[in-house]
Amino acid sequence: MRVYNCHFCSSPVYPGKGIMFVRNDSKEFRFCRSKCHKNFKMKRNPRKLRWTKAFRKAAGKEMVVDSTLAFSARRDVPVRYNRDLVEKTLEAMEKVEEIRLKRERAFYKNRMRGNKAAQLEEDRKLVEAHPELLREREVELRRMQEAGEDDDDEDMSEMEVSEEEESEEEREKVEIALKSKSKRKMRA
């Protein structure tokens, strides 16, 4: 029993799951779900459907050329069982997986590097097109500050009375609460 890859979307097909289609020339096609099978029967190109791995690779969203990807290739050569070999293989598999994940993260960061500048540019255009949005936000912030100052004055007077009766541990809790309130005000 082995885990196959879907012929259409390249996701894993576990034993007992999915659909297997055998063509007249005895070529096997395995599909993870009926969605992939139906798209295959409709002769759709997986590279044009955004949800497939083929699209992601063709569009440059996933790594295509990397030495770690070669380790997942199928090998049909039978090897005599050797405990040491199995142990080393399992260790190597873990290391290869770690390396692959690091490289994928680096690839993703590299791909997303220019997005922040593009997003800022979009935001600038939005503000230029609709300056009234900023004015509305300023009014909301002023209202929140005014409402927040009134509530804080009442809270402070209540806390001063209760602090005289509390022990040192409870005083620390109150101070932490006050700090968090002031941080919230600063954020708003």
From Swiss-Prot:
Residues 147-169 have a biased composition (Acidic residues). InterPro entries: L24e/L24_sf (IPR038630), Ribosomal_eL24 (IPR056366), Ribosomal_eL24-rel_N (IPR000988), Ribosomal_eL24_CS (IPR023442), TRASH_dom (IPR011017). It is found in: Cytoplasm; Nucleus. The keyword Membrane does not apply. GO terms for molecular function: structural constituent of ribosome. Residues 140-188 are annotated as: Disordered. One of its GO terms (cellular component) is cytoplasm. PROSITE patterns: RIBOSOMAL_L24E. GO terms for biological process: ribosomal large subunit biogenesis. It comes from the Eukaryota. It holds the Pfam family Ribosomal_L24e. CDD domains: Ribosomal_L24e_L24. Gene3D superfamilies: Ribosomal protein L24e. Keywords: Cytoplasm, Nucleus, Ribosome biogenesis. Signal peptide: none annotated. The keyword Nucleus applies. Belongs to the eukaryotic ribosomal protein eL24 family. Involved in the biogenesis of the 60S ribosomal subunit. Ensures the docking of YALI0_B00990g/NOG1 to pre-60S particles. Activates and recruits ATPase AFG2 to cytoplasmic pre-60S ribosomal particles. Associated with nucleolar and cytoplasmic pre-60S particles. At the end of biogenesis it dissociates from cytoplasmic pre-60S particles and is likely to be exchanged for its ribosomal homolog, RPL24. This is Ribosome biogenesis protein RLP24. It comes from Yarrowia lipolytica (strain CLIB 122 / E 150).
